[in-house]
Swiss-Prot record:
Protein name (database record): Glucose-6-phosphate 1-dehydrogenase
Annotated keywords: Carbohydrate metabolism, Glucose metabolism, NADP, Oxidoreductase
Pathway of action: Carbohydrate degradation; pentose phosphate pathway; D-ribulose 5-phosphate from D-glucose 6-phosphate (oxidative stage): step 1/3
The EC number(s) this enzyme carries: 1.1.1.49
Similarity comment: family membership: Belongs to the glucose-6-phosphate dehydrogenase family.
InterPro entries in the cross-refs: G6P_DH, G6P_DH_AS, G6P_DH_C, G6P_DH_NAD-bd, NAD(P)-bd_dom_sf
Residues annotated as catalytic: H234 (proton acceptor)
Function, as annotated: Catalyzes the oxidation of glucose 6-phosphate to 6-phosphogluconolactone.
Species per Swiss-Prot/TrEMBL record: Borreliella burgdorferi (strain ATCC 35210 / DSM 4680 / CIP 102532 / B31) (Borrelia burgdorferi)
Residue pairs linked by disulfide bridges in the UniProt entry: none
Keyword Lipoprotein: no
Binding site for NADP(+): R48, D86, F87, K142
Residues that, per the record, bind substrate: H172, K176, E210, D229, K334, K339
Amino acid sequence: MKERSVSNFDIVIFGVTGNLSRKKLIPSLFNLFKNKCISNFRVIGFSRKIFTDKEFRLYIKDSLWQEETDSLIEIFLNFFVYVFGDFNEKESYKNLFKFLDRSRETIYYLSTSPAFYGPIINHLKKYFLSEKLTLSKIVLEKPFGSSLETAKKLNSLLYSAFKEDQIYRIDHYLGKETVQNIFTFRFGNSIFENIWNNRYVDFVQITVAEELGLDGRVEYYDSVGALKDMVQNHILQLLSLVAMESPIKFDSEFIHDEKVKVLKSLRKISKEDIKNYIVKGQYIGSQVQGVFKKGYKDETEFLGNSNTETYLAMKVFINNWRWSGVPFYLRTGKGLARKFSEIYIQFKKPSFTLFNNSSVDFSNALIFRIQPRDGIEIKFNTKKPGYNYEIQTANMEFSYHGAFKRLFDEAYERLLLDAFLGDGTLYATSDEIESSWEFVSDIANKWADIEICNYFYGSEGPKEIDSILEKDHFWRKI
């Protein structure tokens, strides 16, 4: 298949001197350039730091240093220009306009705090965007609001300047190879799609665990928590991909429609039952490999009485024909034993087995490993070599790095290229955002009485999460 590529465009990065830009966006753009996926483009950096173009390029080069490609980096840096500006000042946007080529497509990337989304979009719309509207796109990072109401306000703001097919709401988890492969694995292999339902699936477990705590980000995080920070976007996006019906064709519009149907089918949890479905946790200080790690409340003085969850485990159900009665266990947390993300699908045990004397668990499992090692694993049973008829569990593994020579090492590479090409399949739509916020906001309005369970920094999380499991179900080890 011919390599996807695009040329003749400008990308304006608002907040270009921030961490996201330096660590993710610029290296991803360089790799796309190195692999000849983009050409004849310009990166227009917009920020409040004072730089000449030369100083800006040296600043960018620090995040790209690779000895074997040094000459290529020098060529790449020639595509960069810098515009000094304040996100709230109209003169800054008038100055930016002078740098734009009205004959080329312009992608506006908002690598900023959400607090600046309003000023940036309003200034773009007011001063010059309307003159080249059809040649513009906008890419923005989460959070997409802090509630259903604010998400709707953000969507209204975006629609005042852009059409839906010009808006790209990025969720980097959707750019990971294993996540993308859920779609192909299901609908491209009949042996799996035929058992992808409540007749065969016992439960589904989605885990997004982070090893690091909130170092330096507690003031922002304390107003958000794990429910809004992780469940509303990453985890519900993964759930919708696993649970969706087959679209009538491989097209972004139809794929998004099926994902929305799943989100709208999530069963609301009553206030009376919420304690049986959700466990909230918060990490406390602990020794980790000989180093003391502070607890969440120890990060700053003002957190002394905080009940913000740094860990969340929950059980949800989907009210449709395919998944009725199948629990989906969702969990995410910070300050855990390791960085680890996966989707685990446990299949039901056969109603009858020939091997009643064996202690082996005869339920099979399918695992999508998202990080740290991208891959897919199938757990099955086999005869152990030897004179006796012993059965043991074995794993059949597929590794991306072992099977393919070239990978997108960074999810942003694929997502950026898709945006440049106008492919919104791996981006979230307004309907998805609002549907997920509707579910999450309903929980947030009901769970005030749930107590926070403490867990040690560097552990697996609070032990109380076992209380929400159905009979014979279990949590995977982190």
